[in-house]
């Protein structure tokens, strides 16, 4: 268990984390709601994913670019995504989840209250904004909201994600918790 340093913020991310399964909520109900097949759910529950996150402000537009690279174990290929925090939806296809419309933005806890208060709860004191990602799977009628931020659990600062999955009249909520691995290193050319 490694705490995320206090100087690491969402505005200047360039760091890596590893999922802490002991502190995460059970992801099974979320994956069921998202239509993930049983075998894939079981496999996902056995691996510990690392994630590298980076935020880069664009001085020309004033918008922030958000990069996430997901690194599974055992030498499996990593996957990544880039989002502009402008809340403009773009269509992507993800093998496990199908075709999705994804939009990402900075959001205040008050803005998140309008969707579900869970999305903005629990983050460290003084949090003014978090990263909010919304994904829509129109084929399954599933809308997933997740927020990226930091919170203290038993006095230790972690990167966390609060997730709300809505399908029909049902909502599933969970928090994913990540241990700090360290800063990303520049790739050598």
From Swiss-Prot:
Q: Which UniProt keywords apply?
A: Isomerase, Virulence
GO MF assignments? isomerase activity
Pathway assignment: Mycotoxin biosynthesis
What EC number(s) is this enzyme filed under?
Answer: 5.-.-.-
> Is the Magnesium keyword given for this protein?
no
Q: Give the domain of life.
A: Eukaryota
Matching PANTHER family: LIPOCALIN-LIKE DOMAIN-CONTAINING PROTEIN
- What family classification does the UniProt entry report for this protein? Belongs to the pericyclase pydY family.
Role of this protein: Probable pericyclase; part of the gene scp cluster that mediates the biosynthesis of a hirsutellone-like compound that has still to be identified.
Q: What is this protein called?
A: Probable pericyclase scpY
What organism is recorded for this protein?
Mollisia scopiformis
User: Source taxonomy lineage?
Assistant: Eukaryota, Fungi, Dikarya, Ascomycota, Pezizomycotina
């Amino acid at each position: 268990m490694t705490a995320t340093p206090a100087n690491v913020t969402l505005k200047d991310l360039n760091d890596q984390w590893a999922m802490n399964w002991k502190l995460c909520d059970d992801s099974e109900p979320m994956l069921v709601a998202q239509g993930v097949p049983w075998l894939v759910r079981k496999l996902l529950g056995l691996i510990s994913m690392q994630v590298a996150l980076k935020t880069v402000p664009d001085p020309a537009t004033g918008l922030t670019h958000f990069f996430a690279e997901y690194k599974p174990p055992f030498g499996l290929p990593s996957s990544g995504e880039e989002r502009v925090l402008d809340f403009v939806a773009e269509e992507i296809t993800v093998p496990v989840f199908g075709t999705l419309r994804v939009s990402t933005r900075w959001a205040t806890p008050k803005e998140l209250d309008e969707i579900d208060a869970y999305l903005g709860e629990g983050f460290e004191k003084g949090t003014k904004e978090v990263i909010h990602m919304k994904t829509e799977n129109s084929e399954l009628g599933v809308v997933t909201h997740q927020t990226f931020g930091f919170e203290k659990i038993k006095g230790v600062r972690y990167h966390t994600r609060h997730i709300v999955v809505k399908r029909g009249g049902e909502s599933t909520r969970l928090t994913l918790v990540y241990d700090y691995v360290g800063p990303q290193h520049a790739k050598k050319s």
